Amino acid sequence: MYNGILPVYKERGLTSHDVVFKLRKILKTKKIGHTGTLDPEVSGVLPVCIGTATRVSDYVMDMGKSYNATITLGESTTTEDQTGEVIDKIDVQANAININEVDAVLKQFEGIIEQVPPMYSSVKVNGKKLYEYARKGETVERPIRKVNIDSIARTSELQFEDGKCHFNIEVKCGKGTYIRTLATDIGKQLGYPAHMSLLTRINSGGFDIKDSITLDQISQLHEQDTLQPHLFPLEYGLKSLPKIYVSDENIKTRILNGQKFNKKQFNQTIEQQLVFIDSETEKVMAIYIQHPEKNHEIKPKKVFN
């Protein structure tokens, strides 16, 4: 039985659910879950939690992500990416815009920004996913969402061809960001219809694409009984949370029994969440949170026995 976080390289053409389904067959276990959907036409790293590590998938999902994307100016599509039907078109003449204009616009999108999710997305409105409305030709009012763009930078020259302009960007962002929507919004600021024509996720939850492995490689490693070294311990998925290392056996027992604690008992500033680590084994024992009614107390959220 495997336990840990496996950075899978998702190839284009597969859904995130496909990856989980195939892994369950390869590893012969149902206790597998991914940490953030990647669209079928997007490739890149998809951290997958296996066994007890499924309990920390939310924390991996909440960590930042990085993407390499290609933006195409001159055409917008129904899906905001290269798979949709063209709905608006304006020829971009050679050298109609320059890198200074592009860089200035990109800078405007750093920080907390507002996005309207695309109709072809899994965001729910009135209990239904937006793509369900879109497939029926229906349009509904979509919620404006705030997302965080840590950084965005152009990584290529501008390429003009066939009335379009292409350029690459690298984006570091928070959970819930739609790069497709970012591409179309950048185009609007530059005065052109636009879409995202290529996307690769290069980092997710601290897992880099260079450390990811394909489903074929996973299958081979599993058959050779050499897959375990490629799994990261579940503690890795909690690295963004503050930690308290515990050596006192009595306190360890209380933690593993899910008891509450007075915050003054620990010589450390405690925010909303923290992780208790066994100082001897360096294994996580529990995740504790601020008590909702008693400011001086913390209570268990998840205990790992």
Swiss-Prot record:
<dbReference type="InterPro" id="IPR002501">
    <property type="entry name" value="PsdUridine_synth_N"/>
</dbReference>
<dbReference type="InterPro" id="IPR014780">
    <property type="entry name" value="tRNA_psdUridine_synth_TruB"/>
</dbReference>
<keyword id="KW-0819">tRNA processing</keyword>
<dbReference type="GO" id="GO:1990481">
    <property type="term" value="P:mRNA pseudouridine synthesis"/>
</dbReference>
<dbReference type="Pfam" id="PF16198">
    <property type="entry name" value="TruB_C_2"/>
</dbReference>
<dbReference type="Pfam" id="PF01509">
    <property type="entry name" value="TruB_N"/>
</dbReference>
<dbReference type="GO" id="GO:0031119">
    <property type="term" value="P:tRNA pseudouridine synthesis"/>
</dbReference>
<protein>
    <recommendedName>
        <fullName>tRNA pseudouridine synthase B</fullName>
        <ecNumber>5.4.99.25</ecNumber>
    </recommendedName>
</protein>
<comment type="function">
    <text>Responsible for synthesis of pseudouridine from uracil-55 in the psi GC loop of transfer RNAs.</text>
</comment>
<comment type="similarity">
    <text>Belongs to the pseudouridine synthase TruB family. Type 1 subfamily.</text>
</comment>
<feature type="active site" description="Nucleophile">
    <location>
        <position position="39"/>
    </location>
</feature>
<dbReference type="GO" id="GO:0003723">
    <property type="term" value="F:RNA binding"/>
</dbReference>
<dbReference type="InterPro" id="IPR020103">
    <property type="entry name" value="PsdUridine_synth_cat_dom_sf"/>
</dbReference>
<dbReference type="InterPro" id="IPR032819">
    <property type="entry name" value="TruB_C"/>
</dbReference>
<keyword id="KW-0413">Isomerase</keyword>
<dbReference type="GO" id="GO:0160148">
    <property type="term" value="F:tRNA pseudouridine(55) synthase activity"/>
</dbReference>
